[in-house]
Design a protein with these regions (language model features):
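Short, surface-exposed, charged loop/turn segments at secondary-structure junctions
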Residues: 115, 121-124
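GGW-centered surface loops in extracellular recognition modules
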Residues: 21-107
């Protein structure tokens, strides 16, 4: 039995299993489409060897009558790790994208709040720390978000290309979505003003999928000042902004990305 993978471009990846006879003659072939997007459950976050509950209300403030329960930074970034989930209360959920030759798992929420970019970078979680999870090697990092805003407005998103606009926004504001089966925002999710406390926006499908309202996610890029770093989300699905790399505001969050190695 031979396995065969063919990338047709535009997100179309085919897998085939080919049966061979004794003399190497192909006797049968099954072909199936491998989707370029999946929503998957994988692993849990640990601190100092203790498995942490998944934040079930991953926002800052109160929505739907419930106050957010994202845990604050525990104090030592080097003590965070990923491992097997032993219960539904701890398992993490990821948006998995197969994009050309790259496979990314992007967490569907911030896992830790009140954390600075410097905290994350000090333990190599900004640009990539290698780890093994469920027998697979990944590089754990954060998304790129664009080195500046687009068109002079923070509400217009980040300069393209960047990963937040490609995967979270799914390119919906610049044309056809990049990934047909991934969540797609509606224009009401990215207005030209802040609505970080809006109950209606919180309840819409795109925020329920990505949990961006009221909590920003640190990204890789450095802002124009040199001491600032890019954040995305919080004020809208498309919002781009900067904070000091040392700031640990309660609405600064860590949204990990696992890149398959």
């Amino acid at each position: 039995m031979l396995q065969f993978v063919r990338n047709e471009g535009s997100g179309r990846v085919y897998e085939a299993e080919i049966d061979q006879g004794e003399l190497g003659v192909v006797t049968g072939m099954q072909v199936k489409l491998r989707p370029d997007y999946q929503y998957v459950a994988l692993g849990a976050l640990y601190y100092d060897g203790v498995e942490l509950p998944r934040p079930t209300r991953p926002w800052n403030g109160t929505f739907g009558g419930q106050t957010g329960n994202s845990p604050a930074f525990h104090g030592d970034m080097s003590k965070y790790s990923f491992g097997p989930a032993t219960s539904e209360d701890t398992v993490l959920y990821w948006h998995k994208f197969i994009d050309q030759n790259k496979t990314l798992l992007i967490c569907d929420r911030n896992l830790i709040r009140s954390i600075s970019w410097d905290h994350l970078n000090g333990a190599n979680f900004i640009f990539g720390k290698e780890l093994e999870l469920d027998g697979t090697l990944y590089k754990c990092r954060v998304l790129t978000g664009g080195s500046a805003n687009r068109g002079g407005s923070n509400y217009a998103g980040g300069q393209l290309p960047n990963e937040w606009d490609r995967y979270v926004m799914n390119g919906a504001d610049v044309g056809e979505p990049h990934f047909a089966y991934a969540p797609i925002p509606v224009p009401e999710d990215y207005p030209g003003t802040s609505f970080k406390d809006d109950q209606i926006a919180w309840a819409r499908a795109h925020n329920q999928a990505w949990n961006w309202i009221s909590m920003s996610s640190w990204c890789q890029e450095t802002g124009a000042s040199g001491s600032s770093r890019v954040i995305r989300g919080r004020d809208s699905a498309r919002y781009w902004g900067v904070n000091s790399s040392s700031s640990s505001y309660e609405n600064n969050g860590w949204r990990p990305v696992l890149e398959l190695l």
